[in-house]
């Protein structure tokens, strides 16, 4: 299971700088891979210190972390929903992502002009929101024109879709995002998911600030944080230019020293990647052996057979049981054998809900 996040924002808010920081994330852990698929697409690793600690005990041939695909989506201007600027390309690219990282400018710099002349992250947010909402309304109206005829003829599925579409339409016409709409039944939720509405995607608002404000933010970031809470969205503060400087440092020690001088325990890039991972309700289980220590991504709440299927579909089809070691137990006892001896290995069936950090070994037969 892969995670794909799109970075969006108006011109000159620091979007490309942030993408460059993320693209340099490989330098923070030399063993972890990074590759560029296209000039504006990168695959970066999800930071997880548990893998390194397990590797010190297991001595595997390699460490394989979870990955996240980041897409630097072309800058947006007013009228994108009508195809202005790079609008159609922008909206096509964002539709393919799982979550949105929305960069908002919260710093003053007379050398970097703002497209609207002043610094106002709330206004900037609303510009992009409006364009996405208009595109979603266009999508909904097109679907309604087709679906209402089938619903009138008595088609049960069409009736369900019409009710979902109208619920979204009502909210969007009020200038609100589709993600605030909640559906009670699984059928409604599945129908809503299959519409792939832009404003239904989870969003992380990233407030780009100056180096001096990297730790605590400022009055503008506080406004964004308050608005994000109202929406049920996430927000964070990052100094993208400073993160770019940190990424250029060669040694891990120099990076940590720089962070300490700023009063930060962890780089903003690492925090952002973790937040993006959590934004989609994703967690990690681990397999640990002589060949590799590997992180596997799954949806929170998944049961053992579903997680087995992440490794291979045969594992899910022929699932017998899962041998589970809690991460803390593995670290405490130092090896799988010692965990077994201590009676700390769990033998779990098909109803076991996998927990973040579980070290799993699946038994199956096909």
What is each residue range found by the language model?
Residues 2-8, 13, 19, 146-353, ...:
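C-terminal-of-GTPase-core extension/linker across diverse P-loop GTPases
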Residues 1-113, 141-142, 146-147:
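Conserved G1/Walker A P-loop phosphate-binding module
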Residues 24-25, 50-51, 75-77, 105-111, ...:
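Conserved nucleotide-binding/hydrolysis micro-motifs of P-loop NTPases
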Residues 95, 99-102, 107-135, 139-142, ...:
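Switch/coupling subdomain of P-loop NTPase systems
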Residues 30-31, 112-116, 217-219, 249:
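Short amphipathic alpha-helical segments
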Residues 34, 48-51, 64-70, 84-98, ...:
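Amphipathic alpha-helical transducer elements in NTP-driven molecular machines
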Residues 76-82, 117-132, 151-156, 212, ...:
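Flexible beta-alpha connector loops of hexameric P-loop NTPases
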